[in-house]
Design a protein with these regions (language model features):
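Partner-binding and oligomerization surfaces adjacent to conserved cores of proteins
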Residues: 1-221
């Protein structure tokens, strides 16, 4: 994977309109994940099962993520993050949706007042064929928050190798349960519409309502 400041967010046509109307992306929680092994915490992190249950509950209620694709190498060739057929099928509803290309640095700068108040990371997912790939830590932690800060990479940044073609780059945020959205105002570089996109009239109407241009428009809708 190539981290060159481009973040690719695949979405449905309906969500594209909502995103443009609000100029924001909704954060996801850990209640619904496509990899069943994600955020599974081995029992040896804890002295007793009660602490394990507390930490799992803490993750569900206090942790948020935003997931993106990125550019990647294939046979020594650099391919654009738009070139992800799996993402178009799975997240853009069989190419009826769109892909929003965002500048990572501008995105982080736009939301720095929120992010600087909490613990966050934006890193690439590591793909593995192992169920758990965690070195046994010291099981004594004063709180779930302390544990997650120490081992966020092992818990939140590993997925099964079957998902490798997503080339995921993930923003993980700890302990901001009241925050539901992050702004992408002035962060959008382009919007790539799927080959089966058919909401042109609604998209045109939405764009014309925007008070400022927040992305580059290469064609006339």
């Amino acid at each position: 994977m190539i981290n060159n400041e481009y973040l690719y967010h695949f979405t449905s046509s309906e969500n594209l309109i909502r995103i443009l109307e609000t100029m924001s992306l909704k954060l996801s929680d850990f209640k619904k994940l496509n990899d069943l092994n994600e955020n599974n915490i081995p029992h040896y992190y804890f002295i007793n099962g009660r602490r394990l249950a507390q930490t799992k509950n803490y993750i569900k209620n206090h942790c948020k993520i935003l997931c993106f694709s990125q550019d990647y190498l294939y046979k020594h060739r650099l391919l654009s993050g738009i070139n992800h057929p799996r993402m178009w099928a799975q997240y853009a509803q069989n190419s009826t949706g769109a892909c929003i290309i965002i500048n990572e640095n501008l995105f982080l700068k736009q939301n720095e007042n929120i992010l600087k108040t909490t613990f966050y990371k934006i890193e690439n997912i590591e793909y593995t064929d192992k169920l758990y790939n965690i070195s046994k830590p010291n099981p004594i932690y004063s709180s779930p928050e302390e544990l997650l800060k120490c081992h966020y990479k092992d818990i939140f940044y590993k997925k099964h190798i079957d998902w490798e073609q997503e080339h995921e780059r993930r923003l993980f945020i700890l302990n901001i349960p009241e925050i539901q959205f992050l702004s992408i105002k002035n962060c959008i570089l382009y919007i790539c519409l799927g080959s089966n996109f058919n909401k042109y009239d609604k998209l045109r109407e939405t764009i014309h309502k925007l008070e400022s241009k927040c992305f580059n428009q290469d064609n006339h809708l």
